[in-house]
Amino acid sequence: MAPYWIEKLGISKSELGNVLFFLLISLGIFMFLVGRWQKKLGFSKIISLGILLNAFGLFCLYWVKSPLGLLSWAFLIGMASCFVYIPALTVVQRAFLERKGLVSGIVNMVFGLSAAIIAPIFRLLLQKWGYENMILLLLGLTLGFGLLASSLIKEPKETKLMQSLRGFSLRPKEALKTSSFWLIWSIWALQGAAGISMVILSVPFGLSLGLGMKEAVFLLSSFNIANGLSRLISGFLSDMLGRKPVMGLSFLVSGLCYFLLPQGFSFAGTSLLCLGIGFAFGTLFSVSAPLVSDCFGLEHFGAIFGLVFTAYGFLAGLLGPSFSGYLLDLSGDYQYVFYYLGTFSMISSLLMAFLKKPKP
C-alpha cells in the first residue's frame, strides 16, 4: 500500500516510516496491558474484541484522506493486533508445553505468511476494484472469519503433566530485575528495528534499482514469505537445538544480508538477501516467545512478554522505519541505511551469547 499512499495522500518517505512507528508505539503500549487483561477476561473474549477493533480500523481507513488520519489508523490497528496476538500465543504454549517452540512458530507463521499472501492480492484488488471497495471487502472478511475463529478458543485444561512441566515463574517486577530480561529487551529493540524496516524499504528500494512494480513487490513478498516460513522452521529447530543458537545465527545472517544489499546484485540475488533478512525477523518472533517462557515461566508470560515488546513498540520503530526514512530523505542513498540496519543485526547476534536463564 506504500506506493498508493505516497501518490494519493502525498506523504513523504519519512512520513511513511512514521506510519509503522505509530503502529509499533501502539504495540508497545497495549501488548503489556492485554497480557494482564487476558487473565481476567479470558482468551476468547479478548480475541473477539481484537477482531472488532480491527474491523473498526478498516472502517476508519475507508475515510482517511490525510497523513494524520493514516497515523491514527496505524495506532488503532496496532492496538487491535495486541488483542489477537498475545492471547493466541499464550494459549498454545500452555496447551503444548513440550513443543512451545513449534506451536509458537505455527501461530507466528500465520501472522507472518498472511502478509506475504496478501501483498500481491492487495495489488490486484487495488487495480481491479479500487481502494474503497477493497477496504469494504476486507472489513467483511475480518468480521466473518475473525469472530467465528475467536468463538472456538478455549482455556487449556490443567493436567498433572502440565503442572510438572510448568516449573518456576517470575512476576513481572521480578523479571525486570534480571539481566536476562534487559538483554532480550535490547535484542528486540535492535533486531526488531532491522527487521521491520524492510517492510517499508523493500518496494521503494526495488523501484530505485529500476525494477518494475511487480518485481519490486516480489522483494517484499520474498521478505514476507521467509518471515512467515522461518517462524515455523526456527520454532521447530529451537525445540531441538536450543533458542540461543537458532536466534544468534539467524541474526548474523541478517546482518550479512544487509551489508550485501547495496552491492548491486541481480534481481534473484537481491530477492535472496531480502529472504535472509525476513528469515531472521520471523525467528525473532517465533523463538522469543518460548525463550521468554523458558526464562521467566508461563504464569505471567503475557505481561512479561508485553514488557519485552515495549522495546519493539517504543524503540524499534524509532530506530528502524522512522530514522531510516529520515536518513534516506537526507542522503538519498540506501547504502547508508542498510549498513546502519545491518549493524543492529550484528549486535543482536552478539548479545545472544551473553543471555542466561535466571536462577530460581
Q: Where on the chain are the PLM-derived regions?
A:
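Hydrophobic core of transmembrane alpha-helices in multi-pass small-molecule transporters
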Residues: 57, 68-83, 189, 269-283
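Structural signature of the two symmetry-related core transmembrane helices
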Residues: 45-59, 245-259
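Intracellular juxtamembrane helix-capping segments at the cytosolic ends
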Residues: 83-96, 283-296
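A late C-terminal transmembrane helix in Major Facilitator Superfamily
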Residues: 295-331
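Flexible cytoplasmic inter-helical loops of multi-pass small-molecule transporters
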Residues: 154-170
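Extracytoplasmic gate region of multi-pass secondary transporters
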Residues: 1-5, 179-236, 320, 324
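Helix-to-loop junctions at the C-terminal end of transmembrane segments
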Residues: 30-43, 231-242, 328-329
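Helix-loop-helix hairpin linking two adjacent transmembrane segments in secondary transporters
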Residues: 107-154
